[in-house]
Every structure is written in C-alpha cells, then in structure tokens.
From Swiss-Prot:
Its EC number is 3.6.5.-. One of its GO terms (biological process) is microtubule-based process. It catalyses: GTP + H2O = GDP + phosphate + H(+). Its cofactor is Mg(2+). GO terms for cellular component: cytoplasm; microtubule. This is Tubulin alpha-3 chain. Tubulin is the major constituent of microtubules, a cylinder consisting of laterally associated linear protofilaments composed of alpha- and beta-tubulin heterodimers. Microtubules grow by the addition of GTP-tubulin dimers to the microtubule end, where a stabilizing cap forms. Below the cap, tubulin dimers are in GDP-bound state, owing to GTPase activity of alpha-tubulin. GO terms for molecular function: GTP binding; hydrolase activity; metal ion binding. InterPro entries: Tub_FtsZ_C (IPR008280), Tubulin (IPR000217), Tubulin/FtsZ-like_C (IPR037103), Tubulin/FtsZ_2-layer-sand-dom (IPR018316), Tubulin/FtsZ_GTPase_sf (IPR036525), Tubulin_FtsZ_GTPase (IPR003008). Keywords: Cytoplasm, Cytoskeleton, GTP-binding, Hydrolase, Magnesium, Metal-binding, Microtubule, Nitration, Nucleotide-binding. Dimer of alpha and beta chains. A typical microtubule is a hollow water-filled tube with an outer diameter of 25 nm and an inner diameter of 15 nM. Alpha-beta heterodimers associate head-to-tail to form protofilaments running lengthwise along the microtubule wall with the beta-tubulin subunit facing the microtubule plus end conferring a structural polarity. Microtubules usually have 13 protofilaments but different protofilament numbers can be found in some organisms and specialized cells. PANTHER family: TUBULIN (PTHR11588). The modification 3'-nitrotyrosine is found at Y19.
Amino acid sequence: AVFVDLEPTVVDEVRTGTYRQLFHPEQLITGKEDAANNYARGHYTIGKEIVDLVLDRLSVDYGKKNLDIERPTYTNLNRLIGQIVSSITASLRFDGALNVDLTEFQTNLVPYPRIHFPLATYAPVISAEKAYHEQLSVAEITNACFEPANQMVKTIQFVDWCPTGFKVGINYQPPTVVPGGDLAKLDHKFDLMYAK
C-alpha cells in the first residue's frame, strides 16, 4: 500500500500507530501542508511537489521493463491500473464461476478472513510490438502470475509463520484492451487466421 496525503496528520497516525510495522516508511508519503479543500491549489502547486515521490514509489520502472516506455506518464500508469482493476472486477459484470456479487467478492478473494490483504498479479503485460512475435502458452502465463516481477505490490515480504493461499476464478469474458493503449491484445494471430 502507498499512503499519500498532502497534509501529514492522517499518515502520521499510521506511522506511529499500532500497525506501523506492516508498512514500509518509504510508502508513507506526505507533504508539508494540505490544499485547504482547493482543487487548483492541490493540482497545480502543492500536489505537484510530491508527484515525483509518488511515481518513484509506484514502481514506474514496470512500464519501462514490460511495455518499452522510456518515460511513463500518469496516463500510462492509469491505463495499467485501470486494466488491472477492470480485469479483477470483471466477474461482477459478466458471467463467471466466482465473485458473483460484492459480498462474495471479498469472501472469494480473501483466503483467510484475518489476513485480508489481497495481492493482485497481472500477466502477461507486454507491449503491442512484442505481442506480434511472442507466442505465450497457458503454462507460461500461469507461471508469470506467480513471479514477483508481475505483482502489483513491490514491497510485500511474506513471513514464514503466515499461511498463504490463492484463489482462482474463471470468467468467460476476455479482458478488453484500451484502443491505442500501451497493453497488447493476445489474439492477433487468431484474428489473422480467421481474417481469410
């Protein structure tokens, strides 16, 4: 988790609270003063001061490594996060074997009720250029889901005494890619085969 607030009081409660050891201090980002409920002040002046810190903490190198984007922007980051959230919540909108409504969503997503911090992994994240000449099997995509490089939380460290588990849900609706976006569709060769 990354905690960001222009006003430090709320995040300082996490820094000094009971659960402070759960969060890395570098993931608690605060400014020196708040925007005083003024959008323009937060967007154009005070907020711009911590943008670099936030982008560094959100592992912007993810876009550099996987999508061949030299300098990822907010748009690139928002598209990636939007794609992940859309895919995770697809079973709320379409037919699927699990996560039929919001109450079942948490029940099925959290393997142990006391350990309720879900970790999202998304694979494959490849650019449109790579998709034309890379052939990925189901086994490779499945293995990529368990690689730490594809996890959306970079600072998590599991302890030995904590039980770990995962759940898989099947959704019959494939994810939709933003037209002109950074991520590639994987059905290009299928489309070529049936274009004749």
